[in-house]
Amino acid sequence: MSRPNPKAVDPNQELKERVRAFWQEHPCGTKFSDAEMGTREFFDRVEAHRYGKEWHIPLAADFSSTRGLKVLEIGCGLGTDGAQFAKAGADYTGIDLTEASIELARKRFELAGLKGEFRVSDAENLDFADETFDVVYSHGVLHHTPDTAKAVREIHRILKPGGRAMVMLYHRGSYNYRIGIRVLRRAGAGLLKSEGGIKIVHRLTGEPIDSLREHAQLAQANGGSSTDDFLSQSTDGAGNPLARVYSRREARDLFRDFRKVELRAYFLNKRFIPLIGSLLPRSIESALAARWGWHLWIYATK
């Protein structure tokens, strides 16, 4: 498979630019730390939040298995997972669509004394030669790019024969999508028309007041949200221009060029499980997530 022509006209360029602008302004994970951005304390709090809430990630990613391997992370964000690969002894490269995330990821590695290479790059047009990497990892990123199928083809191209991809996409069959977003958030959207309603939704869901007010302002300015817009803004915040969900069948189809594909689901958004969500032990949470988890992990071997 040949490398894409970087000079070719991209029909999704306008949408991709809006995606880039959103994440440039809101680097993923920054809202989970109130420490000064770019400090050691800032990164420590981001990491504690990530692996406290999404405690399955170290298990699912199996960072230690990448020792001595060339690893590419597509959408490295703040470098939180990237740091785990580097600590495990991987030859790590992280790319992101935004300069803001790359700058923060570099700072995180610098503070921790870790080695890694970083560059701004587009998942749909990777600037790497064929068969460069042993592992390609991407957590919660490719459902935000306009042509996800093209990005997956790029992963296949740059992987060595026998190389493996680990990709997380939002799961269409999840409780979070079918109930949390399509039912509970839709019902709650009507309450956002008043300050009292905003406070009710805040108490019921734990969603920050400022975030709910931003959702309300956007809905009022746009005259409501289409189904696609509502999904996008219900996943990663008000103003998020693009997010998609995938069924297991759709995920398998995306990775059809790979020799072997395995799917696993993780992570229940327990805020949307009334009364008992916060009380669930991890054993039950894991069992439920295996069927209805929000994060659909695709393990694909070239």
Please name every model-derived segment.
Residues 124-135:
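A short acidic, Gly/Pro-enriched loop at the edge of an enzyme's catalytic core
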Residues 259, 281-302:
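Core SAM-dependent methyltransferase catalytic element
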Residues 240-265:
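Short alpha-helix
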